[in-house]
Design a protein with these regions (language model features):
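N-terminal "arm"/small-domain region of PLP-dependent enzymes with the aminotransferase-like
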Residues: 1-47, 59
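PLP-dependent aminotransferase class I/II
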Residues: 30-33, 52, 209-286, 291-294
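Active-site phosphate-binding strand-loop segment of PLP-dependent enzymes
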Residues: 130-192
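PLP-dependent enzyme catalytic core of the Aspartate aminotransferase-like
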Residues: 166, 315-316, 325-363
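Conserved PLP-binding catalytic core of the aspartate aminotransferase-like
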Residues: 129, 276, 286-317
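PLP-dependent aminotransferase-like
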Residues: 94-152
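Helix C-cap/helix->beta junction micro-motif
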Residues: 118, 177-178, 207, 289
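Short loop-beta-helix segment that forms the pyridoxal 5′-phosphate
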Residues: 49, 62-91
Length: 363
C-alpha cells in the first residue's frame, strides 16, 4: 500500500491527526506570496493558459542566469514546463523511446515506470549499503553504444547522497562519446547550500545530450499545484516532449505560482538553515538511539532500523516511508522528512518509547 493510501485510511479513521513524515516537502509550507498570487490569478482562469508557459520559462531562465552566472545564458528555448516532475519524466521517455536504459538503484520509481511505457530494457546499477550508497566509477563500464539513456538523481532519492562531481563528469564524458542521453533529476538540489556549485545547469551548453529535471514541488511546498520544469540545450528533444503529451498541461494558476515562487530568495535561505539545524538534531538523537543513518544532503534522512517500525509508528499517529520496495533494499530501511522542531521532537519521543518497550534499550 502506498504512503498516500495509508495516510488517507488513517485520517478517515482518526480524524486526520496523523503526522506525515513520508512526504518530504518544505516544512516551512508554501510561501505567502505564492498563496496570494494563486488567489489573485483566479480572475484569469476563464481563459486558456499560455500553452508553452512563455512568461514562466522566461522567469526561470532569468533566475538561473542571475543565480548561477558563469555566462550560462539560458533562454526560454532551453526550458520546458510540465504538470509536475512526473509529467516531464514520462514525456522525456516517450520522446526518446529508448531500447535500453541504465538505472541507479535505489532510485525514484517513476523512472522505471515511465520506461516501461516504452518497452525499454533496463540495466540496474546497484549502490551498496557497504559503500554508503555512493555511485562508483565502475558505472561507466555499463555505458556502451547499446545504451540509450542513463537516469541519475542528485541528491539521490531515497538516500539523499550526492553523486561525487568527478563521477558525474566521467558519466557525462562517457555518454557524450557513446551518444547516450543523460537525465539528471535535481529536484532536491535546492535544499543544499552548495547547489550552485553542484548543479549541472552550468554545463548545459557543453553537453547537448543532457536533460536536467527540476520542480517547485519540494522546495516551495507546492505539491498540489503540480509544476516542474526541464532544462536542456537539445531543442529538438524539447519539441518531441511537447508532442509526447497533451497541450495546456500547466494551468494558469500553476504558471502564476511558479513566477511568484522564483522571487522567494529569503524563503530558500531560511529553509536551508532550518533543515540543517533540524537534521543535526535528529542525527544526535539517532546516535543516542543507536540508529544507523546516512548523512545525506536533502530535506530527508535515510536510515536503517527494526522491521515493522513503520507499523509501530502508525499506531502512534506517525507515518514514515518504508523503503523496502526499492530495488536492493530490504525490510528495515526507511526515510523520514525533516520537519519543524516540535514535529521532529514528537518523532524522536515516539522512537524512544518504541525502543524502550520493544527492544529494551533503556534509552
Amino acid at each position: 500500500m502506498k504512503a498516500s493510501d495509508i495516510l488517507n485510511t488513517y485520517n478517515n479513521a482518526h480524524g486526520g491527526d496523523i503526522l506525515d513524515f513520508s512526504a518530504n516537502v518544505n516544512p516551512n509550507g508554501t510561501p505567502q506570496s505564492v498563496k496570494d498570487t494563486i488567489i489573485g490569478s483566479l480572475d484569469n482562469i476563464a481563459a486558456y493558459p499560455q500553452i508553452y508557459c512563455d512568461r514562466l520559462r522566461h522567469s526561470i531562465a532569468d533566475y538561473y542566469n542571475a543565480y548561477i552566472g558563469d555566462g550560462i545564458n539560458l533562454t526560454d528555448n532551453n526550458i520546458i514546463c510540465g504538470n509536475g516532475a512526473a509529467d516531464l519524466i514520462y514525456r522525456y521517455a516517450l520522446a526518446i523511446k529508448p531500447s535500453k536504459a541504465v538505472l541507479v538503484s535505489p532510485c525514484f520509481c517513476e523512472y522505471e515506470e515511465a520506461l516501461q511505457c516504452c518497452g525499454c530494457n533496463n540495466i540496474i546499477h546497484y549502490m551498496l549499503d557497504t559503500q554508503d550508497f555512493v555511485i562508483k566509477k565502475d558505472i561507466c563500464s555499463l555505458l556502451d553504444c547499446d545504451v540509450d539513456i542513463i537516469f541519475l538523481c542528485n541528491p539521490n532519492n531515497p538516500t539523499g547522497i550526492n553523486i561525487p562531481p568527478d563521477i558525474i563528469c566521467g558519466i557525462l564524458t562517457e555518454c557524450e562519446k557513446n551518444n547516450i542521453n543523460v537525465f539528471i533529476d535535481e529536484c532536491f538540489l535546492d535544499f543544499l547550500n552548495d547547489d550552485k556549485e553542484r548543479t549541472c545547469i552550468k554545463e548545459i551548453n557543453r553537453y547537448n545530450n543532457m536533460f536536467i529535471l527540476r520542480a517547485f514541488t519540494k522546495i516551495y511546498a507546492m505539491a498540489g499545484i503540480r509544476l516542474g520544469y526541464g532544462i536542456t540545450s537539445d531543442y529538438g528533444l524539447i519539441n518531441k516532449m511537447y508532442k509526447s503529451g497533451a497541450p495546456w498541461n500547466v494551468s494558469t494558476i500553476a504558471q502564476a505560482a511558479g513566477i511568484a515562487a522564483l522571487n522567494e530568495k529569503d524563503y530558500i535561505d531560511s529553509t536551508r538553515l532550518l533543515i540543517n539545524k533540524e537534521k543535526q538534531y535528529i542525527y544526535n538523537e539517532f546516535d543516542r538511539l543507536k540508529i544507523k543513518y546516512w548523512k545525506g544532503s536533502a530535506d530527508y534522512i535515510f536510515f536503517k532500523s527494526k522491521n515493522n517500525l513503520k507499523e509501530d509508528l502508525i499506531k502512534m499517529g506517525i507515518l514514515i516511508r518504508d523503503c523496502s520496495n526499492y530495488y536492493n533494499l530490504t525490510d528495515g530501511y526507511y526515510r523520514i522528512a525533516v520537519k519543524k522542531h516540535d514535529d521532529n521532537e514528537r518523532l524522536i519521543n515516539a522512537l524512544k518509547y518504541i525502543f524502550n518497550i520493544y527492544l529494551g534499550n533503556g534509552v
